[in-house]
Swiss-Prot record:
Single biological process term from Gene Ontology: mRNA splicing, via spliceosome
Subunit structure as annotated in this protein's UniProt entry: Component of the osk RNP complex, which is composed of at least exuperantia (exu), ypsilon schachtel (yps), aret (bruno), cup, and the mRNA of osk. In the sponge body, forms a ribonucleoprotein complex (RNP) containing at least me31B, exu, yps and the mRNA of osk; interactions with exu and yps are RNA dependent.
Polar residues bias spans: 454-467
Keyword list, A-Z: Cytoplasm, Developmental protein, Phosphoprotein, RNA-binding
Primary localization class, coarse: cytoplasm
CC terms in the record's Gene Ontology section: cytoplasm; cytoplasmic ribonucleoprotein granule; P-body; precatalytic spliceosome
One Pfam family hit: Exu_RNase_H_like
Name the record gives this protein: Maternal protein exuperantia
Function: Ensures the proper localization of the mRNA of the bicoid gene to the anterior regions of the oocyte thus playing a fundamental role in the establishment of the polarity of the oocyte. May bind the bcd mRNA.
């Protein structure tokens, strides 16, 4: 699917880089191994993404743990796994988009240590005769082993992991070899489980019909007596059981969500078990069924050491691939089609050992002829793709030329729809230009609503609605200085007094006259004579 290969609009999927084995294939030696189904949920399909859920399954035990990632899930991963990251205050946590509940999670190193403890316990329970564990996964393009090994290398837990786990095995190769139907294009777990369930039902129906035809003549009376002995009370109980079973079936369908890693781990184990025991009904706990399963999947199992070497090569290819980002910058700014083509070109160049510095040296020595010779050695590209890539690289390295931009083809239907929408939008804008006095029209712009309309077209607090075509004149407030300084101050005051708004202020209070204070003469000093 494109959603799985495109990560946030730019596809840099590690799973798309190379699904072919690198180097000589190291087969798993014969021995007594424990088969475990494994799967993961991640924040994306890149090697730099993180694991969100790690799950493993055996018929006797299972492991499941959610991991709190540092980055958020991209839209494709959120849609597939139905899990998203939320922030409450200073805390980040996982929340299910199905149940709307908070999911208990751990850090990546704590979850990996728990997973290693669980694997070591499985090996200990099997006894000293056990040679190790084989992890079975199911996917079209190899991605799960790379993510698990990269996480283990990050925390220095790879040696402890290789002490218990000896090999990874992809069950999709077993499905292609067992079914071999050219009409089946998608070997997903959901598709294979449906195919295997239908074949099992057909086999059960055939066996029931043959047994019924052989024993129906001799036991017909007993069958009739059994059918007659059923009472109405028993039938009501049966109906209740049917209702309960249907309810449980609906609940089971809700729980069997293939976007969950624990469900896919169990499906991977069950599908491999049924494919390897197609002759009879497989019993998961029987040693014979598990032995048949190991013998069937052993040709497709590889040692962990070879997967580690492949991971190192994938990291080198990823570095080469990222070096071409400036060349395809215009491709990533256009449509999804050109982004996918840019990813394809980058992957092919990186897998053939080219990086930006290597091609730059070739162009500096032999110009476009050297680039043409280098691209001719790539057999995966068509002649049209080689011509497009050659023109793009030459325009990038040549300073006299401008970098080629991809041509986006226009669609006539889209143009017609665009004109139709514009025509409708013009009519609607004319209708919207009419003033509306309804309260709903004035409240739809509140609380950060539609801000496309200008503020001048909104009605003010006055009773008179301004005309949309005539701008509203704002009257300046007259201060005391402007009233005394300008000669129009008396005129404005006269206009205001003549209006009916200020009729109550026409009668002024009588003026109060204050008489000036007359200074009283100061008294003259009187001489007092003393008498005997």
């Amino acid at each position: 699917m494109v959603a799985d290969n495109i990560d946030a609009g730019v596809a840099i999927a590690v799973a798309d880089q190379s699904s072919s084995p690198v180097g000589d294939k190291v087969e798993l030696p014969a021995g007594n191994y424990i088969l475990v189904g494994v799967d993961i949920d991640t924040t994306g399909r890149r090697l730099m993404d993180e694991i969100v859920q790690l799950a493993a399954y055996t018929p006797t035990d299972h492991f499941e743990q959610y991991i709190m990632p540092y980055m958020n899930l991209n839209p494709a991963a959120r849609q597939r796994h139905q899990v998203r990251v939320i922030s409450i205050g200073f805390y980040r946590m996982l929340k299910s988009m199905q149940t709307y509940k908070i999911i208990k999670s751990k850090s990546e190193i704590a979850a990996l240590k728990d997973f290693l403890n669980w694997l070591e316990q499985l090996k200990t329970k099997a006894g000293p005769s056990s040679d190790g564990i084989v992890l079975i996964y199911h996917e079209e393009r190899k991605f799960i082993p790379y993510m698990i090994l990269e996480s283990l290398k990050k925390y220095g837990l790879l040696e402890r992991f290789t002490a218990s786990v000896k090999s990874f095995a992809n069950s999709i190769n077993l499905a292609k070899a067992s079914i071999g139907d050219a009409n089946i294009k998608n070997y997903s777990l959901r598709k294979l489980s449906k195919i295997l369930s239908t074949t099992k039902e057909e086999d059960a129906a055939c066996s029931a019909s043959t047994s019924g035809s052989g024993s129906g003549l001799g036991s017909g009376s007993s069958m009739v007596s059994d059918s007659v002995s059923i009472s109405p009370r028993d039938s009501t109980v049966t109906n209740g059981d049917d209702k309960q079973s249907s309810k449980n079936a609906v609940q089971g369908k809700r729980e069997l969500f293939d976007g969950n890693a624990s469900v896919r781990a169990k499906l991977a184990f069950d599908v491999a078990l049924q494919l390897s025991n197609s002759d009879g009904k497989p019993e998961p706990k029987s040693s014979e069924a598990l032995e048949n399963m190991f013998n069937a999947i052993r040709p497709f199992a590889k040692l962990v050491v070879s997967d580690v070497l492949e991971l190192d090569i994938q990291i080198e290819n990823l570095e080469r691939q990222n070096s071409f980002r400036p060349v395809f910058l215009n491709y990533f700014k256009t449509t999804l089609y050109h982004r996918v083509r840019a990813v394809k070109f980058r992957i092919v160049l990186a897998e053939n050992g080219f990086d930006l510095n290597t091609l730059s040296a070739i162009w500096a020595e032999k110009n476009i002829e050297g680039l043409d010779i280098a691209l001719q050695s790539i057999g995966r590209l068509k002649s049209k793709d080689k011509a497009e890539l050659l023109e793009l690289l030459d325009s990038y390295f040549d300073p006299k030329k401008t970098t080629v931009k991809p041509v986006v083809k226009g669609n006539s239907n889209n143009n017609n729809n665009y004109r139709r929408r514009n025509r409708r939008g013009g009519r609607q804008s004319v209708k919207d230009a009419r003033p509306s006095s309804s309260p709903s029209a004035s409240t739809e712009f509140g609380a950060g609503g539609d801000k496309s309309r200008s503020v001048s077209s909104l009605p003010d607090s006055t009773t008179k609605t301004p005309s949309p075509n005539k701008p509203r004149m704002h009257r300046k407030r007259n201060s005391r200085q402007s009233l005394g300084a300008t000669p129009n101050g008396l005129k404005v005051a006269a206009e205001i007094s003549s209006s009916g708004v200020s009729e109550l202020n026409n009668s002024a209070p009588p003026a109060v006259t204050i008489s000036p204070v007359v200074a009283q003469p100061s008294p003259t000093p009187v001489a007092i004579t003393a008498s005997n």
